[in-house]
């Protein structure tokens, strides 16, 4: 008996109810911010702020302290500045608007709220039909230490002043005409000094500011008397300025890759030459103070490198990053009575990650970050979330990660402002991410910030070109400049076949299965001790005895020969290689039964990793549908291979199979003898070629034959809406080594709409999926 229902149109009331029942709200963002564009730090509150190209501002303090603000207009944040110690922050957008944000308390929680905004009059952006006016476009902002005045340098060379915190424009604007009156005649080469590139407050006299113009002129301007105290006649295009702590000198950086040190003297109002001029990657020179700068590399040889250089005495390191340097700052002493800055850490914001360098330890090592670790250090190909992690497993994963990185101590994290008021999570949660480079990374997902715990690499199991590339990298580090690779973001993979496609974990036994692009299925177990053994390989052919098929895809990954050393952590048990080596589309693990199931576009297989032997394999497109009573079930282990070579009676006679509509036709079809013949390789449409892709697999102890007897089963769902269920004869724990697992074909279910089956779950009487531990305890 069949029922057909006419599909109803979209009911407005139904859609409204659907919105009420299914609502998705963003609660937290994990990982590194997308497209960062600005950086700021408050040394008093010990808070760091990052602005993005999408108009977001994110504030970070101690682990768990995070706040986010979003501008109304989607414009890139070009600059951000903290009002020191006030819990306020200024932002400049690329639409030339300035915004004041404030951290406010609501319901005992801190929120980032915009309180004021300002736009400099006269700015007209490019609109296609109106000529742009960039004269009042803000190029640089200077926030005075008193936090009561904001200076704005513009592209037209003017400097404007705003009163804080109201963002009121003051009648104190400084234009190039006033400056040009003090410039010597021989230095005036044209009518313009160029845009304002840098504004810096005098460290000892807050009434004076240093103004740097792009053509190279630097002016020390007195705000009270409105006159020029000193002129510094630079001849190179200016990039930035920074004061020396005493205020007796400052450093200017230039477009030719060099920097100059200038002396500030009241007896010499017009300085033509600096104290020293240095091109770091010209001839090496002895430099005593600590000097930090980004860029400066010879364009012809290293113009494509993203570098930041650290110079101190005879030590010279060029930090080589894999993404662009956005900005950086140092964490140093802010006490004016101290003679030196005494920097303790260098914080570098890159386009794809955040890197912190310890400046007080020998060799300037990196400091592990408790948050903002780039999830996408290598492209993410899959993920797996584990909730309510057992304490023993959690401690063992933590221990393995600490042995990987002995210096990984988050207590030394220098950005520690604020206080995390959220209570510690009662349950531990793990997030596992599979990556294109063959790694699986373990993250602490119990709180707001994702903390990296442990990294598993599968590349050492296979013979790849990784070792050759590493040797080339080490050889390159001995050259000049002294490059040192820093950061974990690496968008390139040595071999795309290493990519992890599926992950399955048993949190009670510490067993893990990862499957890759080249048909590799790797069974691992968590070990606390180092081991050294050969790679155990088992090959499973999913297309046994199928003639006429030629695999035209990539080759399998060759396993590494000889003995392989495995560090404490997840270690290899057996490597199962599917043939043909197509990407694995589904994998599942049952540690109690010592079984794994895996599927590709060519079928699925069941493997006993305790006996290192396959239980059965099957291609969904070649299987015989179960259309009779369950008593006619045969052992897959004995007859499944023969079923690959059988075809239905309709194909033997060359006729299309008739649709079964009555019980009589079912009996006749099952009673008919089908002679084993070689199946013809017939061309299939693109849709038909994808119908055999296995989308999901599931182990369950459930009822398959009837409603009174339950037992081990395995279920498989395909892209064409088919579900295959098998009863498993699993021996007891004592007889695992003596008896093998048997698989019996149970049921085939074909969904009428033939939509892909993406997940299968077995529910208990209350409609909940039973925990594997609960099932084990009830036994």
Spans of model-derived segments:
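Sequence/structural signature of beta-propeller modules
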Residues: 1-15, 630-650, 655-665
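N-terminal alpha-helical scaffolding segments that mark the starts
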Residues: 1-58, 67-70
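Per-blade loop-tip surfaces of WD-repeat and WD-like beta-propellers in eukaryotic adaptors/scaffolds
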Residues: 15-25, 59-68, 100-123, 156-189, ...
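Canonical WD40 repeat/beta-propeller blade segments in eukaryotic WD-repeat proteins
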Residues: 30-40, 75-82, 119-143, 181-202, ...
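Structural hallmark of WD40 beta-propellers
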Residues: 45-49, 67, 86-90, 99, ...
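Short coil/turn segments within WD40 beta-propeller repeats
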Residues: 54-55, 95-98, 156-157, 215-216, ...
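Non-catalytic interaction/regulatory modules that flank or connect domains
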Residues: 273-376, 591, 602-603, 710-713, ...
């Amino acid at each position: 008996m069949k029922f057909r229902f006419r599909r109803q149109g979209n009911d407005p009331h139904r859609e409204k109810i659907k919105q009420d029942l299914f609502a998705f709200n963003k609660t937290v963002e994990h990982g590194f911010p997308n497209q960062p564009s600005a950086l700021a730090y408050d040394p008093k509150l010990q808070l760091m702020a990052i602005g993005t190209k999408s108009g977001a501002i994110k504030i970070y303090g101690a682990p768990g302290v995070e706040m986010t603000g979003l501008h109304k207009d989607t414009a890139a944040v070009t600059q951000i500045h903290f009002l020191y110690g006030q819990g306020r922050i200024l932002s400049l957008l690329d639409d030339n608007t300035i915004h004041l944000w404030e951290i406010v308390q609501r319901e005992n929680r801190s929120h980032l709220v915009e309180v004021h905004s300002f736009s400099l009059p006269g700015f007209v952006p490019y609109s296609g039909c109106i000529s742009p006016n960039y004269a009042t476009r803000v190029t640089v902002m200077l926030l005075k230490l008193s936090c009561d005045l904001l200076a704005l340098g513009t592209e037209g060379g003017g400097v404007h002043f705003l009163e804080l915190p109201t963002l009121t424009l003051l009648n104190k604007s400084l234009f190039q005409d006033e400056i040009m009156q003090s410039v010597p005649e021989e230095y005036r080469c044209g009518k313009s000094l160029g845009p304002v590139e840098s504004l810096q407050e005098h460290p000892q006299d807050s009434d004076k500011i240093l103004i740097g113009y792009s053509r190279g002129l630097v002016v020390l301007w007195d705000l009270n008397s409105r006159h020029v105290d000193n002129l510094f006649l630079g001849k190179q295009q200016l990039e930035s300025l920074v004061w020396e702590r005493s205020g007796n000198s400052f450093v200017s950086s230039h477009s030719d890759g060099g920097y100059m040190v200038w002396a500030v003297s009241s007896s010499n109002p017009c300085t033509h030459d600096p104290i020293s001029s240095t091109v770091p990657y010209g001839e090496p020179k002895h430099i005593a103070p600590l000097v930090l700068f980004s860029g400066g590399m010879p364009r012809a040889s290293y113009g494509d490198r993203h570098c930041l250089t650290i110079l101190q005495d005879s030590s010279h390191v060029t930090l080589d990053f894999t993404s662009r340097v956005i900005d950086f700052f140092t964490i140093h002493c802010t006490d004016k009575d101290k003679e030196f800055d005494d920097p303790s850490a260098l914080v570098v914001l890159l386009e794809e990650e955040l890197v912190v360098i310890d400046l007080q330890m020998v060799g300037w090592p990196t400091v592990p970050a408790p948050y903002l670790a780039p999830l996408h250090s290598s492209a993410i190909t899959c993920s797996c979330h584990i909730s309510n992690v057992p304490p023993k497993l959690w401690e063992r994963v933590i221990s393995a990660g600490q042995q990987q990185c002995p210096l990984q101590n988050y207590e030394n994290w220098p950005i520690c402002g604020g206080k995390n008021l959220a209570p510690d999570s009662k349950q531990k949660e793990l997030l596992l991410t599979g990556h294109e480079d063959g790694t699986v990374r373990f993250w602490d997902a119990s709180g707001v910030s994702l903390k990296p715990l442990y990294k598993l690499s599968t590349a050492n199991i296979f013979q790849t070109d990784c070792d050759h590339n590493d040797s080339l990298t080490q050889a390159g580090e001995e050259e000049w400049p002294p490059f040192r690779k820093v950061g974990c973001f690496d968008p390139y993979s040595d071999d795309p076949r290493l990519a992890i496609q599926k992950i399955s974990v048993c949190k009670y036994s510490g067993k893990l299965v990862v499957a890759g692009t080249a048909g590799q299925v790797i069974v691992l177990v968590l070990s606390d001790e180092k081991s050294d053994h050969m790679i155990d390989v088992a090959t499973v052919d999913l297309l046994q005895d199928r003639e006429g098929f030629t695999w035209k895809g990539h080759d399998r990954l060759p396993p590494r020969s000889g003995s392989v050393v495995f560090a404490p952590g997840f270690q290899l048990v057996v490597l199962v290689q599917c043939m043909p080596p197509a990407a694995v589309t589904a994998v599942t693990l049952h540690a109690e039964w010592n079984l794994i199931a895996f599927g590709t576009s060519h079928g699925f297989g069941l493997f006993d990793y305790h006996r290192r032997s396959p239980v059965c394999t099957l291609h969904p497109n070649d299987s015989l549908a179960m259309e009779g009573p369950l008593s006619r079930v045969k052992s897959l282990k004995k007859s499944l291979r023969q079923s690959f070579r059988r075809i239905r009676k309709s194909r033997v006679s060359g006729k299309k199979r008739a649709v079964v509509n009555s019980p009589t036709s079912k009996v006749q079809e099952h009673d008919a003898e089908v002679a084993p013949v070689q199946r013809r390789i017939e061309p299939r449409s693109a849709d038909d070629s994808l119908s055999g892709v296995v989308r999901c697999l599931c182990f369950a102890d459930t009822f398959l034959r009837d409603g009174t007897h339950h037992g081990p089963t395995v279920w498989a769902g395909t892209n064409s809406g088919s579900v295959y269920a098998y009863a498993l004869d699993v021996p007891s724990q004592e007889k695992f080594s003596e008896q093998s697992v048997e698989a019996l074909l149970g049921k085939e279910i074909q969904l009428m709409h033939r939509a892909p089956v993406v997940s299968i779950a077995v529910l208990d009487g209350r409609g909940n999926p039973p925990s594997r531990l609960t099932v084990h305890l009830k036994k």
